């Protein structure tokens, strides 16, 4: 039985993971993290499944086999340090991390296995495998990336879009131009090798990422469309299962599933 601790239990992703984990026969929910100002009884009454709650990170990791984190950068940093100190693997999907925050994650990965992904969809993991193949075979084609999310999403471009862009850039030979964010008034003509990235925020879109490869004569569009946050939750729980027993290090989701 996999004993799982969870952050961000009142957020969209935390609730999705909680609901799915509660119905999984191989997972035991041991603890959830809430903000100190919140009343644990009030929060517990609003959750989709029973869960012991704490506002103390040190208590969160006690008795857990793995921590799944979908929270805020400041929380992620504290959880990463606590997990490393306790020797507990960490699955983190928090985005918007600073360079300092990422350095803390890297230090934690020296002591415990850490899987970090901006998107825990298994389809996105496979897209990271597919895109380099396309770009390598079509080296002169223009590449643009368009991502769409709900109106409430704060970071733009999304962490997933940035990760996909890095995958595309790494597959480009020779060395590509930098990323181009949007194409507003006064934008210079497209340069060979560059990758354009565009963010759309509207409605209730859970997440859609489209990679466009084009010449003057033809084009290919590859689109991944998430219809439910359960897709992310399923990927995060699968990552937690596969992380157990791995040596310390920083893993991507595609490291675990491809």
Curated annotation (Swiss-Prot):
Cellular localisation: Cytoplasm
Active site: 149 (proton donor/acceptor), 153 (proton donor)
Keyword Transferase included in the entry's annotation: no
Function summary: Catalyzes the conversion of 4-hydroxy-tetrahydrodipicolinate (HTPA) to tetrahydrodipicolinate.
Positions of NAD(+) binding: 8-13, 93-95, 117-120
Broad class of where this protein is predominantly found: cytoplasm
Pfam families the UniProt entry points to: DapB_C (PF05173), DapB_N (PF01113)
Origin organism lineage: Bacteria, Pseudomonadati, Thermomicrobiota, Thermomicrobia, Thermomicrobiales
Chain sites annotated for binding (S)-2,3,4,5-tetrahydrodipicolinate: 150, 159-160
Organism annotation: Thermomicrobium roseum (strain ATCC 27502 / DSM 5159 / P-2)
Catalytic activity line of the entry: (S)-2,3,4,5-tetrahydrodipicolinate + NAD(+) + H2O = (2S,4S)-4-hydroxy-2,3,4,5-tetrahydrodipicolinate + NADH + H(+); (S)-2,3,4,5-tetrahydrodipicolinate + NADP(+) + H2O = (2S,4S)-4-hydroxy-2,3,4,5-tetrahydrodipicolinate + NADPH + H(+)
Protein's recorded name: 4-hydroxy-tetrahydrodipicolinate reductase
Family matches, as SUPFAM superfamilies: Glyceraldehyde-3-phosphate dehydrogenase-like, C-terminal domain, NAD(P)-binding Rossmann-fold domains
UniProt KW keywords: Amino-acid biosynthesis, Cytoplasm, Diaminopimelate biosynthesis, Lysine biosynthesis, NAD, NADP, Oxidoreductase
């Amino acid at each position: 039985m996999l004993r799982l601790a969870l952050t961000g239990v009142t957020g969209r992703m935390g609730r999705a993971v909680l609901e799915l984990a509660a119905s999984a026969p191989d997972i035991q929910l041991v603890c959830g993290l809430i903000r100190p100002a919140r009343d644990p009884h009030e929060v517990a009454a609003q959750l989709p499944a029973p869960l012991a709650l704490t506002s103390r990170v040190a208590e969160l990791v006690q008795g857990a086999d793995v921590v799944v984190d979908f929270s805020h950068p400041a929380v992620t940093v504290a959880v990463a340090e606590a997990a490393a100190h306790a020797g507990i693997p960490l699955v983190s999907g928090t985005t918007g991390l600073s360079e300092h925050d990422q350095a803390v994650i890297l230090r934690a990965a020296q002591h415990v296995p850490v899987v970090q992904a901006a998107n825990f969809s298994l389809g996105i993991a496979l897209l990271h495998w597919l895109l380099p193949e396309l770009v390598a075979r079509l080296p002169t084609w223009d590449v643009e990336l368009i991502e769409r999310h709900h109106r409430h999403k704060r970071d733009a471009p999304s962490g997933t879009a940035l990760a996909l862009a890095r995958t595309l850039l790494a597959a480009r030979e020779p060395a590509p131009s930098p990323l181009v964010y949007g194409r507003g008034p006064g934008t210079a003509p497209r340069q060979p090798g560059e990758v354009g990235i565009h963010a759309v925020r509207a409605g209730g879109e859970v997440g859609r990422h489209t990679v466009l490869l084009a010449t003057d004569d033809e084009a290919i569009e590859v689109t991944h469309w998430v219809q439910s946050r359960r897709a992310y939750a399923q990927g995060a729980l699968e990552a937690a299962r596969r992380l157990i027993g791995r040596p310390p290090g920083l893993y991507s989701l595609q490291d675990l599933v491809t």
